[in-house]
């Protein structure tokens, strides 16, 4: 197993690869932000380490929806169009979708942002 494979496996099994933030104000909107396959580039040990481990990088963090109360950031550290989910528990698109249904159930408006790999998961969410 390469060093890069070990790093990704460690983050996949021990990290949620999800960040949830709240505005503190009661609002009826939740926003879901899905990373693209541009989470890190090029695909090298050093770049993956800096982006995922050192910086704990999620995309869209500077473009938060201003009228959302809850912000859910997800990342696909394998850059496989979310086919392996986001971690070892939520290890498929279907499991991520079911988990998100619980996370958004108390909101009447849902905004979802994603491009590239994130767009694939966004399309799956829209169907459900």
What is each model feature region?
Residues 66-88:
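Cap/lid segment of the alpha/beta-hydrolase catalytic domain
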Residues 30-32, 70-75, 111:
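Hydrophobic/aromatic beta-strand patches that form the interior of the parallel beta-sheet core
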Residues 98-102, 111, 128:
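Catalytic phosphate/metal-binding cores of nucleic-acid and nucleotide-processing enzymes, i.e., regions
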Residues 3-68, 80:
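Short, surface-exposed "cap/lid" segments of acyl-processing enzymes
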Residues 105-115:
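Alpha/beta-hydrolase fold nucleophile elbow
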């Amino acid at each position: 197993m390469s060093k890069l494979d070990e790093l990704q496996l460690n983050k996949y099994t021990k990290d949620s690869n999800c960040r949830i933030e709240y505005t503190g104000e009661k609002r009826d909107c939740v926003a879901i932000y899905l990373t693209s396959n541009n989470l890190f580039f090029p695909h090298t040990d050093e770049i993956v380490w800096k982006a995922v481990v050192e910086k704990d990088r999620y995309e869209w963090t500077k473009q938060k929806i201003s009228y959302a109360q809850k912000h859910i950031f997800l990342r696909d550290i394998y850059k496989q169009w979310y086919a392996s989910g986001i971690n070892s528990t939520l290890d498929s698109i279907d499991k991520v979708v079911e988990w998100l249904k619980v996370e958004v159930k108390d909101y009447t408006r849902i905004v979802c942002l994603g491009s590239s790999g994130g767009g694939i998961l966004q399309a799956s969410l829209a169907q459900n």
